[in-house]
Amino acid sequence: MTEAMNITLSTQPADARWGEKATYSINNDGITLHLNGSDDLGLIQRAARKIDGLGIKHVTLAGEGWDTDRSWAFWAGYKGPKGTRKIEWANLDEAGQKELESRLMIIDWVRDTINAPAEELGPEQLAQRAVDLLCKAAGDKMSYRITKGEDLREQNYMGLHTVGRGSERPPVLLALDYNPTGDKQAPVYACLVGKGITFDTGGYSLKQSAFMDSMKSDMGGAATITGALAFAITRGLNKRVKLYLCCADNMVSGNAFKLGDIIRYRNGKNVEVMNTDAEGRLVLADGLIDASAQKPELIIDMATLTGAAKTALGNDYHALFTFDDKLASRLMASAAAENEPFWRLPLAEFHRSQLPSNFAELNNTASAAYPAGASTAAGFLSHFVENYHEGWLHIDCSATYRKAGVEQWSAGATGLGVRTIANLLTAE
């Protein structure tokens, strides 16, 4: 066992020999991080990334100043997808310790689940992992149903079945009910819907390798929103919430769906498929139909839905779309409280009509005349939300995963978004 490296905090600048912009310095007692009052959490996270890069895999957070958020910021930057790391944590009060332990259990679960190879994490495995996490968080206050394969077709979950039928691993719908009072007549406060594409080849609209190599992470929306529900429960969520995970592989085979196919949904909408790589919206539609049927106050869907959102925001922000300005303000307030990055992008009534088809009511992708791809994708989803003007949030989660490490994050999943959605669910 290696001896732990002490990591301490200071509000004094580093010795001039380290340079005027030095954020950390090394001394006989260990490593000191020099906080300057400007984005201290970001400074700690970036310093932790550098410390990990030095090959230091065992540290102690020593001295004063280590609260819950600073401790978590260090771990967010220190954690990576390879190897093991050990932290001796600073002493926190009971509430702070409980919060840190919840983050370690749940947000690490989200990061590790998204990072898992697709070979190990198919649709059924993803649904079962979600059930296991929520059982741990909620105990007997939850119930669930898993529907898969041909049962989906028989029950008219045609979007999910159509996308997933081309894989040897059957598509799966997880419907989970968190009901803390146990009253079967209790109203549903919120419905959460997650895109769980466990690997996305693009189907017959095949991706290039450079765009396919990270597609094990295309279930990032499902993992993140599952983590958000679990985290809200650990923070005392006392309202009924239902979760729908739409899980499938998007593969090429003799049974895979094709361009020109028409999907007929339970709500009466018909959709022509003109791009099999725009599959996420097709599976989410089924979950949104179920969510709308519950008449909740709030519907939130999360999906790694479009490259257009990444073009606009990079991997630095989650993109928020909604017609509900008050709800957008609440979400942004939750994001600010949790120090997580969200950015609102446009969604207007005209985006709903930018999906023309010659053979169906809707096309699953906009034509070249309508290049706002993230907004038209949100417009598509709105056709499956009964009251889309109020109480609906669509999150195109661009900040879920990074193909390469940066100064603040290792390569792989970030876990961003879990705390914001949990905050929104538990806010009074």
UniProtKB/Swiss-Prot annotation:
Function text: Probably plays an important role in intracellular peptide degradation.
Residue positions of the active site: 207, 281
Domain of life (superkingdom): Bacteria
Name of the coding gene: pepB
Keyword Zinc-finger: no
EC main group: hydrolase
Source organism of this protein record: Enterobacter sp. (strain 638)
Enzyme Commission number(s) from the entry: 3.4.11.23
Co-factor(s): Mn(2+)
Keyword annotations of the record: Aminopeptidase, Cytoplasm, Hydrolase, Manganese, Metal-binding, Protease
Chemical reaction(s) catalysed: Release of an N-terminal amino acid, Xaa, from a peptide or arylamide. Xaa is preferably Glu or Asp but may be other amino acids, including Leu, Met, His, Cys and Gln
GO CC annotation terms, alphabetical: cytoplasm
Compartment(s) of residence: Cytoplasm
Name of this protein: Peptidase B
Annotated PANTHER family: LEUCINE AMINOPEPTIDASE-RELATED, PEPTIDASE B
Main location: cytoplasm
Listed CDD domains: Peptidase_M17 (cd00433)
One GO BP: proteolysis
Positions bound to Mn(2+) 1: 200, 277, 279
A GO molecular function held by the record: manganese ion binding
